[in-house]
UniProtKB/Swiss-Prot annotation:
Lineage summary: Bacteria, Pseudomonadati, Pseudomonadota, Gammaproteobacteria, Pasteurellales
Keyword Nucleotide-binding listed: yes
Stored Pfam families: Cpn60_TCP1
Enzyme class: isomerase
A GO CC annotation given for this chain: cytoplasm
Keyword ATP-binding appears in the UniProt entry: yes
Lineage: superkingdom: Bacteria
UniProt binding sites for ATP: 30-33, 51, 87-91, 415, 496
Cellular location(s): Cytoplasm
Key words, A-Z: ATP-binding, Chaperone, Cytoplasm, Isomerase, Nucleotide-binding
InterPro entries in the cross-refs: Chaperonin_Cpn60_CS, Cpn60/GroEL, Cpn60/GroEL/TCP-1, GroEL-like_apical_dom_sf, GROEL-like_equatorial_sf, TCP-1-like_intermed_sf
Reaction(s) this enzyme catalyzes, per UniProt: ATP + H2O + a folded polypeptide = ADP + phosphate + an unfolded polypeptide
Protein name per Swiss-Prot or TrEMBL: Chaperonin GroEL
């Protein structure tokens, strides 16, 4: 086992604080409408330019191991805030730095760290309750646009795009961010249920100019097995031909004779058919087939429950207004499924999201909810260079997470005002069990002014003057650092999602509390590299001439 370096008490805390400040000082320059950029060197390719707090935090690794421990703990604050709400990483870092600095001063003055931590925890619980009380629902498209604009560093085009996307696909719909091809941002919306399986044969194409298959008012048969024998599907084909409607076959696979016969029938115009593979694999495929069945009021023909394809009737087939199939995707538009059943299915999948521990599973389940609930919107980000594209994509991603958080838990006045108001209210009523807890409460409430002060500092103004003016006001009254004006933050469109502010405060206080109560730090001693004896002798080859 490697030898360890151990530091105690104030020596340990001073080192840790130095690491905290290095990381937080690098992150906090990005806060607010006039926050600056940070340039990150990359091993390959061009450097990355960002205003995203967590991206800056992730890059920082310090040489001194004790300082690095402090930096890594604050990095954890930014990461946790990012995971929980997708935004608020810089606010969380600024809060953590403020609480740690204030807390360690109190510890150095001889206060009991455990009582300080209890006081901080009490203050945070009370302020979170107060934030919930002043929060208002985020319902209108205008409010969603404002939240997106603020989170994208006052970029109004991003706010507008996100608001449009949410309007099109609903608040549950999936919105993804991709690289665009031009200079301008664009929004693509896919309505209905789309899955990533294209036609099994190009001979099904009936719109050659677009290279797609389009079926109007088709029947849809869903089969949970491979179809290789045409006899199995013949009864359904005959029934559909009599009904005079097209047919979409969604099966695990269709091969050999069965596929050839379907192609021939389509080319001769006997029956209009298209076939695609079922989306997903294994259990996920079964679940997605069931989703399509509920959306189209059909039944999955599955041998597992004793159903036979040869005995399938028109009643077991789903229907939709329209189906569009490209070589890569199939889109089912306006399935005739029962609204109540679709809602029940969505609720069931949401419960699975709650229970799931895997991020990958959660993402896939969320996609299924979106496909059932409304559709998918794609925001294509445009920029002049790749570096600018990356930076903008990060901002759009942040804004997207912020608007989702706002829809979920509501909005509070932005610009650090919500924390100042909540802290002022709590300060008049909250007391601890002893004097040291009261100090903990006071230092936590004082630290909650830090985001407002940092926003003002980054805008080049005097933080103490603005903080005093904001505290003298009430309600939504605050300072707009973008326009350097005071006024009602909600009316000026300066909004923060309640969830983002709440998460930032809770994670910052949690990690800061652990740091304040640290008394000992242990790390590996650096290993001394021993010289290889053979390498050391390498320079002696020329000694032969000494004789």
């Amino acid at each position: 086992m490697a030898a360890k370096d151990v530091k105690f008490g104030n020596d340990a805390r001073v080192k840790m604080l130095k690491g905290v400040n290095v990381l937080a000082d690098a992150v906090k320059v990005t806060l607010g409408p006039k926050g600056r950029n940070v340039v990150l060197d990359k091993a390959y390719g061009a450097p990355t330019i960002t205003k995203d707090g967590v991206s800056v935090a992730r890059e920082i690794e310090l040489e001194d191991k004790f300082e690095n421990m402090g930096a890594q703990m604050v990095k954890e604050v930014a990461s946790k805030a990012n995971d929980a709400a997708g935004d608020g990483t810089t606010t969380a870092t600024v809060l953590a730095q403020a609480i740690v600095n204030e807390g360690l001063k109190a510890v150095a003055a001889g206060m009991n760290p455990m009582d300080l931590k209890r006081g901080i925890d009490k203050a945070v619980v009370a302020v979170v309750e107060e934030l919930k009380a002043i929060s208002k629902p985020c319902e209108t498209s205008k409010e969603i646009e404002q939240v997106g604009t603020i989170s994208a560093n006052s970029d109004e085009t991003v706010g507008k795009l996100i608001a449009q996307a949410m309007e099109k696909v609903g608040k549950e719909g999936v919105i993804t961010v991709e690289d665009g091809t031009g200079l301008d941002d664009a929004l693509d919306v896919v309505e209905g249920m789309q899955f990533d399986r294209g036609y099994l044969s190009p001979y099904f194409i009936n719109k050659p100019e677009a290279g797609t298959v389009e079926l109007e008012n088709p029947y849809i048969i869903l089969v949970d097995k491979k179809i290789s024998n045409i006899r199995e599907i013949l009864p359904v084909l005959e029934a559909v031909a009599k009904a005079g409607k097209p047919l979409l076959i969604v099966a695990e696979d269709i091969e050999g004779e069965a596929l050839a016969t379907l192609v021939v029938n389509t080319m001769r115009g006997i029956v209009k058919v298209a076939a695609v593979k079922a989306p997903g694999f294994g259990d996920r495929r079964k679940a997605m087939l069931q989703d399509i069945a509920i959306l189209t009021a059909g039944t999955v023909i599955s041998e597992e429950i004793g159903m036979e394809l040869e005995k399938a009737t028109l009643e077991e087939l789903g229907q939709a207004k329209r189906v569009v199939i490209t070589k890569d995707n199939t889109t089912i538009i306006d399935g005739i499924g029962d609204e109540a059943q679709i809602k029940a299915r969505v609720a069931q999948i949401r419960q699975q999201i709650e229970d799931s521990t895997s991020d990958y599973d959660k993402e896939k389940l969320q996609e299924r909810v979106a496909k059932l609930a409304g559709g998918v919107a794609v925001i294509k980000v445009g920029a002049a260079t790749e570096v600018a594209m990356k930076e903008k994509k990060d901002r759009v991603d942040d804004a997207l997470h912020a608007t989702r958080a706002a829809v979920e838990e509501g909005i509070v006045p932005g610009g650090g005002v919500a924390l100042v108001r909540a802290a002022s209210k709590v300060a008049t009523t909250l007391t601890g069990d002893n004097e040291e807890q009261n100090v903990g409460i006071k230092l936590a409430l004082r630290a909650m002014e830090a985001p407002l002060r940092q926003i003002v500092t980054n805008a080049g103004e005097e933080a103490s003057v603005v903080a005093r003016n904001v505290k003298d006001g009430n309600g939504n009254y605050g300072y707009n650092a973008g326009t350097e004006q005071y006024g009602d933050m909600l009316e000026m469109g300066i909004l923060d999602p309640t969830k983002v502010t709440r998460s930032a405060l809770q994670f910052a206080a949690s990690i800061a509390g652990l740091m304040i109560t640290t008394e000992c730090m242990i790390t590996d001693l650096p290993k001394e590299e021993k010289l290889d004896p053979a390498a050391a002798m390498g320079g002696m080859g020329g000694m032969g001439g000494m004789m």
